[in-house]
Amino acid sequence: DLHLCDRRQRQMCIRDSHKAVGSFIRRYGEYIAEGADLPAYVETTFKNDEKGDPLVTKDALVALGVMTAEQYDAIKEETQKITQIVADDLKEKGMVLYDIKFEFGYAPDGSVMLIDEVASGNMRVYKDGQYIDPMTLSQLFFA
């Protein structure tokens, strides 16, 4: 899911899902099994708890002036690249990345950049079919 956070600050939270879990399964659970593979699926929603984080398309983001089509494409591409690096590192340790969240913002020149750390609390990871809580994940990953 691509979550757009405080629009005034022009920060975005991005969720890239490799497995059908979380908000994706809440929306589409009657159409797909929980944990089913998703090919680096990136979904865009506005981060708005009162409205249930409504879905928003790339075209809507452009029309609303939230970002350009090029900025959206850059965020999506960067998200998928970073996610694959994290997934590969976890796989080396016998773990499976289900989904991960990043925060992106804009540099003064308008380019998109990652503005948050890659942390265990921002991802869902499983080992041998069991969810790994963030504290345990940190211990396993850095062991």
Where are these regions (language model features)?
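Single conserved hydrophobic/aromatic residue that forms the stacking wall/gate
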Residues: 1-10, 14
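Short, His- and charge-rich active-site/binding loops that engage polyanionic ligands
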Residues: 11, 15-58
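Conserved metal-phosphate-binding beta-hairpin within the catalytic cores
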Residues: 16, 97-117
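Short histidine-centered catalytic/ligand-binding loop motif
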Residues: 46-78
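A long amphipathic alpha-helix within ATP-dependent nucleotide-binding catalytic cores
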Residues: 66-98
